[in-house]
């Protein structure tokens, strides 16, 4: 057995898990995106050609990594030092409670905690060492459990991020 650190994991599926035994695994998929099929003909052609180019040994170009493992580790380390001020943490908690009590959207404790790491990472990537409510915008892809929750979660978060636009 060779132990290897899991740095990141990406997955794709045509359906969401319905079997309760998969809930713990699904809960660990932090960012979630719903993507529709490609309906536009020109975009489908781009998709097909890209697939065929990647499969062809004559045209297949080596994938270029845009960030090194060391850079990723540095970002992860720096994010741990980002301060989340008490007022931001209070708004974070209030938003979660609003989702639960007003909208019956339950965010697991794991996702509540990992959401804080998302705020810290957002701040670092924006060049800040303090998280703000503006960082909440990334939680729109973290806090939903069912597709029907997506819009509700998005609107609740945007009311906090940009209260004047939401009115």
Residue ranges and their predicted role:
Residues 1-65, 76:
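Canonical AAA+ ATPase core
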Residues 38-40, 67, 84, 107, ...:
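Short coil/turn linker and secondary-structure boundary residues
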Residues 58-115, 123:
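Conserved AAA+ ATPase small/helical "lid" subdomain
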Residues 98-110, 124-167:
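C-terminal engagement/docking regions of AAA+ P-loop ATPases
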